[in-house]
Each structure stands twice: as C-alpha cells, then as structure tokens.
Regions:
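Conserved thiamine diphosphate
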Residues: 28-83
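Short, hinge-like loop/turn segments at secondary-structure boundaries
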Residues: 3, 28-32, 105-108
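Generic secondary-structure signature for well-ordered alpha-helical cores
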Residues: 5-8, 18, 56-60, 78-85, ...
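Thiamine diphosphate
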Residues: 1-21, 72-75
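Glycine-rich beta-alpha junction loops
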Residues: 17-19, 69, 92-98
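Short beta-strand segments
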Residues: 11-16, 90-92, 136
Length: 137
C-alpha cells in the first residue's frame, strides 16, 4: 500500500486464488463473502478486500487477468513492466485442493475453464466490474 501511495517504480504481480491454500484452506483477505473455508465453515462473513480500489486510489497502474486468459495476462504484465511508477497486476488463479472442491469443481481444469465464462475483457474503462479483466492506467 505504501509503494502505491508513493508511486514507487516497482511492479507487483499477485497470483490471487482467494484462499490460503498451502496451509489447509483458510479464509484470506480476498475470499468471497459466504465462501466456506477451513476457518469459516459456515461461510465467510467479511467482504473481500477491493485490491483494485486500493491501487487505483493513488492513480497507479492496475491490471487484472486470469490463468485462463493467458495472452491477456502476458499483456498486463508487459504493460506493467513498461509503466513508470507503481504497477500492480492481479491474476486470478485456481486452488482446486482447498477451494475448488468445496465449491463443487471436479478438477483444476474445470475450475480454470469457469474463468472463461465468468470473466470478460474490458479494454475501455476506468473501473473494472467484479467479472471483468483489463487494465487501468
């Protein structure tokens, strides 16, 4: 947060699977509300942190993509690296072991393919909706 506030010339690439998957599947700051996890068996009561709002509040570069949209993700990373000042790329990723199966996915491929249906590319925006991927400069 301080780096974005100061517009430090660095690029952050965040692979976000919305869960602490390597330690058993605990709720994370980006876990969706009502999602069941190891630490929220009745469902998460907290809204996820709005990463986009945190980064764009300081007029910094923000890109969002998914593991399904590989070429788009590469474009986000390339443009972030070319950007002078702070840049942040959030790539939505799947965690089948500690999240996907709880949500009813049979395997990682099925979970990744859900990104194809869920996320749409928006090339002309100052704000991305929850189901949109794109770049805000």
């Amino acid at each position: 947060m301080h780096a974005s506030r100061r517009n430090t010339d660095i690029t952050v690439i965040c692979i976000s699977n919305a869960i602490y998957g390597m330690t058993g599947g605990q709720c994370s700051p980006t876990t969706e509300i009502t999602s069941k996890t190891l630490t929220t068996p009745r469902g998460n009561v907290d809204s996820p942190i709005n990463v986009q709002a945190l980064i764009t509040a300081h007029n910094c570069f923000y890109g969002r993509s998914t593991t399904f949209h590989f070429n788009h993700a590469l474009k986000c990373v390339f443009e972030a690296l070319q950007h002078k000042g702070f840049s942040f790329v959030e790539i939505k990723s799947q965690c089948i072991t500690n999240d996907g199966r709880r949500r009813g996915f049979k395997n990682s491929y099925e979970m990744m393919m859900s990104y194809k249906e869920t996320y749409k590319i928006n090339n002309n925006t100052n704000k991305l909706e929850h189901n949109e991927i794109g770049i805000i400069k």
